[in-house]
């Protein structure tokens, strides 16, 4: 497999292995006719014999491997010299270049360490454990808990699954990268497809491959040789022709699988202790709808079967919290094929949407932001000025109007630049904080659309701060305080990362240094823990990335604080400084707290599991009459709560018992259930209980409304308890 974002460099793997691959000779001796019969459990059986390309590929590989081993042996004999390997604690270990491997050094420390190490890191670059060291270097030994080690572990697992897919389906493998939680592999099949019924037989074959402890081997090969090796696979040839710009590149082998890959990988397939195939879908080659349709299979793996059990439990919990399911069950929102990627918010979903916007709007007033309204459609000349047309036009909805090209806006910043520039500006106006809830559109591929998390139509709590260079620190402090206020109301903890100047940046290095220093000062004064992502900033300015943690431990990036030195230059934005200089350039701070309102609703839906806090709940109050004689009073009660701007409903179903009505309201997640009978009717009261069946007893209507208004205004997280 070969991914543009794969880790590098890759490495040669040691370990004993049969010359052709475990089980291969036996497989080749099988009958001439391919057997595609299903396995006993209804899945698909392994092909017998394997596709011819596997044997041809292996023959070429074995010749190249013999040449490679000969060259490496000669290099180890002639060029080897003593080197120093520096460990993280500063200790130095003696080694020999072209001979000593990271695995050998790990064994020298302890066998337990060697066994638990997933991958090495040499001079800050991930490196195969069995690949010889080449010079003096630093060495880290990464375990599965490390994010880079997880990526390698799942990458190797993808190769195991890829081998099984070739042996079962016989198609052409495409991309197969590690992803945030696991891995996938795409395969092109000329006929037929993948079924979830195949998973058990695929998993069984993966377990067999794992049991064989097939070594991962790395080989650097000339591009033209690889074009011959992969001539059966037009997708690999496309990768070689379109993405490989060097005379050579690398392949990895495990068993009969040989694939284009930068690597690195675990030592052998036996390092994967638990593997599960859990999902399949179809996709397009490189996500382009006019290209071939591919079959994608997803998997997950761990170094301990207990971890897989925990993952399965977590998946079940996540499934129960899926915002698409809850949105359906609670009648909040839905999607329709006639407007893909654009959500229909039903009345109760619209309440949540508007409550979030009003929350942010109320904070804007406190914090000196001014809300603006900008057009949805702009001439393409605007996007050419901003630079988005050159880099982002494929993701924009564009159309012709009177022989001019226009587009729906995918972001607000260029429009805000026009707003800043429509008249001369003075230093007295800065910082100028412009906020916009405008509708945005991005042309996401239909196959990538996923509920509310990936949409085409959305709104953001988008704001741009135009400020002087010396004002950056205070503005960033304000942004950080803003996000802490909002996230504490939701009950989210969060992580902060400062991303600094990348290698390819625009602007003056002095300006970058000054801005980064102000960001650091702001973060330090903010008082929350933060980490440095050196070199990970955008080319136009440093940024602070914020990830929130939900109720089941998942992280989501919503908020962003991004400095921009380039957009003011592109739009030639200036202001008159206090010393009379009318060519002073402002800095733009892009910031959002919710990010996409749609995506935040998805996160909140799953975080709360549909059990909304009172202020945000679309079902705040349910009035339940004891019997028909109390229906009229119940309707009056419901109207009073409605007039007080609560989401209040009434259950007048004569076919339900009182207990059934109360239980229905609790299951529907009404925060407060107000029971009214003859006693309450006479006294003008309500009897209050919560969705968790906490009974607060009898209160007057006015007293209840006043208390609920307080809880709503303060956005209490536990209103039912605090009542």
From Swiss-Prot:
Origin superkingdom: Eukaryota
Keyword Isomerase: no
Residue numbers carrying Phosphothreonine: 246, 453
Catalytic activity, EC: 6.1.1.3
Organism: Homo sapiens
Main location: cytoplasm
Lineage: Eukaryota, Metazoa, Chordata, Craniata, Vertebrata
Protein's name in the database: Threonine--tRNA ligase 1, cytoplasmic
One Pfam family named in its UniProt record: TGS
């Amino acid at each position: 497999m070969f991914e543009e974002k794969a880790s590098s460099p890759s490495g040669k793997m040691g370990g004993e292995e049969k010359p052709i691959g475990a089980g291969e000779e036996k497989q080749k001796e099988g009958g001439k006719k391919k057997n595609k019969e299903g396995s006993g459990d209804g899945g698909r059986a392994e092909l017998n014999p394997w596709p011819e390309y596997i044997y041809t590929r292996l023959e070429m590989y074995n010749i190249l491997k013999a040449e490679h081993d000969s060259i490496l042996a000669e290099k180890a004999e002639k060029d080897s010299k003593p080197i120093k390997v520096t460990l993280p604690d500063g200790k130095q270990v003696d080694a020999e270049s072209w001979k000593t491997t990271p695995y050998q050094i790990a064994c020298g420390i302890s066998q337990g360490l060697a066994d638990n190490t997933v991958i090495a890191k040499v001079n800050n670059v991930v490196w195969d454990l069995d690949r010889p060291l080449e010079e003096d270097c630093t060495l880290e030994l990464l375990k599965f808990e490390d994010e880079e080690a997880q990526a390698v572990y799942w990458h190797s697992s993808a190769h195991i699954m890829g081998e099984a897919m070739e042996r079962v389906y016989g198609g052409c493998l495409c991309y197969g990268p590690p992803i945030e939680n696991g891995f996938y592999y795409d395969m092109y099949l000329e006929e037929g497809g993948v079924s979830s019924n195949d998973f058990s037989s695929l998993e069984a074959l993966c377990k067999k491959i794992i049991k064989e402890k097939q070594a991962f081997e790395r080989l650097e090969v000339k591009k033209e040789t690889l074009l011959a090796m992969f001539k059966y696979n037009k997708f690999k040839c496309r990768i070689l022709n379109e993405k490989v710009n060097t005379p050579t590149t690398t392949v990895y082998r495990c068993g009969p699988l040989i694939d284009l890959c930068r690597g690195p990988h675990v030592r052998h397939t036996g390092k994967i202790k638990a593997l599960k195939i859990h999902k399949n879908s179809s996709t397009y080659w490189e996500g382009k709808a006019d290209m071939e349709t591919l079959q994608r299979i997803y998997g997950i793996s761990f170094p301990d079967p207990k971890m897989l059990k925990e993952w399965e439990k977590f998946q079940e919990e996540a499934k129960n919290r899926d915002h698409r399911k809850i949105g359906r069950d609670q009648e909040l929102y839905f999607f329709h094929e006639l407007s893909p990627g654009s959500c229909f918010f039903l009345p109760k979903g619209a309440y949540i949407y508007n409550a979030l916007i009003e929350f942010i709007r109320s904070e804007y007033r406190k914090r000196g932001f001014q809300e603006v309204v900008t057009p949805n459609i702009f001439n393409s000349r605007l996007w050419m000025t901003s630079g988005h047309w050159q880099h982002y036009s494929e993701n924009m909805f564009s159309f012709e109007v009177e022989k001019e090209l226009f587009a729906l806006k995918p972001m607000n910043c260029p429009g805000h630049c026009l707003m800043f520039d429509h008249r001369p500006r003075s230093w007295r106006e800065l910082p100028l904080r412009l906020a916009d809830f405008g509708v945005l559109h991005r042309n996401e591929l239909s196959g990538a659309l996923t509920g509310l998390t990936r949409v085409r139509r959305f709104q953001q709590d988008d704001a741009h701060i135009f400020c002087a260079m010396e004002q950056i620190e205070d503005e960033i402090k304000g942004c950080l305080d803003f996000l802490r206020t909002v996230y504490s109301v939701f009950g989210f903890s969060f992580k902060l990362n400062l991303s600094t100047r990348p290698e390819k940046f625009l602007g003056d290095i002095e300006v970058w240094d000054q801005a980064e220093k102000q960001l650091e000062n702001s973060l330090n004064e903010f008082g929350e823990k933060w980490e440095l992502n050196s070199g990970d900033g955008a080319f136009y300015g440093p940024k602070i990335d914020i990830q929130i943690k939900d109720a089941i431990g998942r992280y989501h990036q919503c908020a962003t604080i991004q400095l921009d030195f380039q957009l003011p230059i592109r739009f030639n934005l200036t202001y008159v400084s206090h010393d009379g200089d009318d060519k002073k350039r402002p800095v733009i701070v892009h910031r959002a707290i919710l990010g996409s309102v749609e995506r935040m609703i998805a996160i909140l839906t799953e975080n709360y599991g549909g059990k909304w806090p009172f202020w945000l709940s679309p079902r705040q109050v349910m009035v339940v009459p004891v019997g028909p004689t109390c229906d009229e009073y119940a309707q009056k009660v419901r109207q009073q709560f409605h007039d007080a701007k609560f989401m209040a409903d009434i259950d007048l179903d004569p076919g339900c018992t009182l207990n059934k009505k109360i239980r229905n309201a609790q299951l529907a997640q009404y925060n407060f259930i107000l029971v009214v009978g003859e006693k309450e009717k006479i006294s003008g009261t309500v009897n209050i209980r919560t969705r968790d069946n906490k009974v607060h007893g009898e209160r007057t209507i006015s007293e209840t409304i006043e208390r609920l208004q307080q809880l709503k205004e303060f956005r209490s997280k536990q209103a039912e308890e605090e009542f």
